[in-house]
């Protein structure tokens, strides 16, 4: 990268807050061998080997003991000299070691600054850098494996392959601009439009994989709504496989929203159980009902629960009418164990209808499968990498530019410009074409020490 940064020495605790057996201080900067010698009492650590040593303060008194590792740049995570101090994991000990690092000239690192330096020093591209945070934040094994694929460059290789094809096609198209009277014949002979169509097909494949990766990262927010005592809390417990919410036969037991994250086939699903919807004079219950509608506004999908013995009553119809028209929903007819109906999937008024029993779990797997289908998840295979919404936006813009390029290919200057814009959009993913403010936003969301 050609973006500049101040080459100050930075330091941070790289392990999680709290007490533990081991705590790690990470330091990055230029020419850190004297730094390592000062904190270890004059020892010269062998690069990429663990050196057992005491860690000393400015007066020669030991603060802690443990392992010192020295990674000379550029063969390090950040591309600079990197030191790791692996001591005991107590907060007080780590605070003393961090203060000693500051005494030796380091400053406290900003969130994500180590990874940002790795990006700026061409150790990682931007998609790989983001996957560091995604791997840390992964809420399922599938998401973690996909994030690791991105960190190892699976997503970046796909993008670089598309960009390379675009560059070659641009070179061909722009070379014809000097020969306007022959440019169309030249492009036809070179099969420019055929190459463009193949490129668009490749992009569609990458886009589909990226969408699956984005679902693994973002998951979906599902709100449970319905009248009191229709089994919303029981269904939440059935989906979670645990007793998350209190369940009684008393209508109105749930008076506030209860949130739980579960994992369905590797996809994080944020379930929100809500207060039952009914007319009430109870002040507390009214507040809970208002929060129910607030949760509905923020949800990706609604599960409208109905007592299968009663069906779509006038009260249920009023709830249906208030749901946002654009909000996807599934009508869940619960308590089939009491109504005598069979669990299964159907459709009503253009929306899915699932019959189940939250108490016996009969039909719950049908609902889980339907949720994944509605969010567009087809299952993670070995090739799925994790992606973010900004990646999907960039791919969509590139696809739009390639569509325009094909439509206007006989106007060669427009053809060339649309190819350039498509290349720029894709290059935003890996960071070859990114604004400083975008980088600031991305790395500010990392934890300190990464």
Curated annotation (Swiss-Prot):
Its cofactor is K(+). Keywords: Cytoplasm, GTP-binding, Hydrolase, Magnesium, Metal-binding, Nucleotide-binding, Potassium, tRNA processing. It is found in: Cytoplasm. Gene3D superfamilies: P-loop containing nucleotide triphosphate hydrolases, Probable tRNA modification gtpase trme, domain 1, tRNA modification GTPase MnmE domain 2. K(+) binds at residues 229, 248, 250, 253. Residues 219-376 form the TrmE-type G domain. It comes from the Bacteria. GTP binds at residues 229-234, 248-254, 273-276, 357-359. (6S)-5-formyl-5,6,7,8-tetrahydrofolate binds at residues 26, 84, 123, 450. One of its GO terms (cellular component) is cytosol. Mg(2+) binds at residues 233, 254. One of its GO terms (biological process) is tRNA wobble uridine modification. One of its GO terms (molecular function) is metal ion binding. Binds 1 potassium ion per subunit. Its EC number is 3.6.-.-. It is an enzyme of class 3 (hydrolase). InterPro entries: G_TrmE, GTP-bd, GTP-bd_TrmE_N, GTPase_MnmE, MnmE_dom2, MnmE_helical, P-loop_NTPase, Small_GTP-bd. PANTHER family: TRNA MODIFICATION GTPASE GTPBP3, TRNA MODIFICATION GTPASE GTPBP3, MITOCHONDRIAL. Homodimer. Heterotetramer of two MnmE and two MnmG subunits. Belongs to the TRAFAC class TrmE-Era-EngA-EngB-Septin-like GTPase superfamily. TrmE GTPase family. NCBIfam families: mnmE_trmE_thdF, PRK05291.1-3, small_GTP. Exhibits a very high intrinsic GTPase hydrolysis rate. Involved in the addition of a carboxymethylaminomethyl (cmnm) group at the wobble position (U34) of certain tRNAs, forming tRNA-cmnm(5)s(2)U34. This is tRNA modification GTPase MnmE. It comes from Chromobacterium violaceum (strain ATCC 12472 / DSM 30191 / JCM 1249 / CCUG 213 / NBRC 12614 / NCIMB 9131 / NCTC 9757 / MK). The lineage of its organism: Bacteria, Pseudomonadati, Pseudomonadota, Betaproteobacteria, Neisseriales. The gene is mnmE.
